[in-house]
């Protein structure tokens, strides 16, 4: 029977949507999104979710429309959202690393540092962040809000831009050069202050944060199990670059032990043959969805 307690969750629509839903699935929360729907279904009666742009998430969470939500640190700063920052979740639309807001100019531009922006015109989606950055560097320049396609604006429509990038490939494709990093940002789980003060909601949010972080920790990791003769144990263990000391368990045959270890997936193709040569048997690999520290 339902206890009628529900946590209202805001999920980012747009570039972060697919990677966020995949992360939640690995954490054990399976959302289903119908075409053109902003209301995903979820296999948890205690959750209600709505898809909304990350740029607006902080404001709606601070107002109490959502109890919790996921958005970038950049948008929390840009909108001056009064929220509880629960957890750093370092992932983005295409990778498991932070994004950067960078100052960029045409490759042929004489601008070399932020100081060279004095009296210039800058286009960006993060007007407040850019104005603060200029003020901190003692630079007077005009800042215009950009509704999109910011990379195409220099040099005709702007002298420089402040734009978000993961790899820099889009900037290079538009013949732009990065001058400086303005801000590094990653996704954050945030909470409404009143919701955070509610014991049930806080526990629900904290549990979610733990599982999401565990899913991030497990990215690129696999588990290995194997049996090993005690006589070869030192040799086998010395060749395992494990995240932690391997777990060793006795077997019915007193001359053998079972080993279990978590390693980077990248090394498995070279590690398994070496383990076999060192004397390990019955080696098998398994996927890890969550790794809780």
UniProtKB/Swiss-Prot annotation:
CDD domains assigned to the protein according to its UniProt record, in alphabetical order: PBP2_HisGL3 (cd13593)
The protein's name in its UniProt record: ATP phosphoribosyltransferase
Localization: Cytoplasm
Domain of life: Bacteria
Functional pathway: Amino-acid biosynthesis; L-histidine biosynthesis; L-histidine from 5-phospho-alpha-D-ribose 1-diphosphate: step 1/9
Keywords: Amino-acid biosynthesis, ATP-binding, Cytoplasm, Glycosyltransferase, Histidine biosynthesis, Magnesium, Metal-binding, Nucleotide-binding, Transferase
Source organism per UniProt: Chlorobaculum tepidum (strain ATCC 49652 / DSM 12025 / NBRC 103806 / TLS) (Chlorobium tepidum)
Enzyme nomenclature, EC number: 2.4.2.17
Pfam families per UniProt: HisG (PF01634), HisG_C (PF08029)
Regulation of protein activity: Feedback inhibited by histidine.
SUPFAM superfamilies according to UniProt: GlnB-like, Periplasmic binding protein-like II
GO cellular component, one term: cytoplasm
Cofactor(s) the record lists: Mg(2+)
Family named by the database record: Belongs to the ATP phosphoribosyltransferase family. Long subfamily.
A GO BP entry: L-histidine biosynthetic process
Catalyses which reaction(s): 1-(5-phospho-beta-D-ribosyl)-ATP + diphosphate = 5-phospho-alpha-D-ribose 1-diphosphate + ATP
Role this protein plays: Catalyzes the condensation of ATP and 5-phosphoribose 1-diphosphate to form N'-(5'-phosphoribosyl)-ATP (PR-ATP). Has a crucial role in the pathway because the rate of histidine biosynthesis seems to be controlled primarily by regulation of HisG enzymatic activity.
GO molecular function list: ATP binding; ATP phosphoribosyltransferase activity; magnesium ion binding
Leading EC class: transferase
InterPro entries attached to this UniProt entry: ATP-PRT_HisG_long, ATP_PRibTrfase_cat, ATP_PRibTrfase_HisG, HisG_C, N-reg_PII-like_a/b, N-reg_PII/ATP_PRibTrfase_C
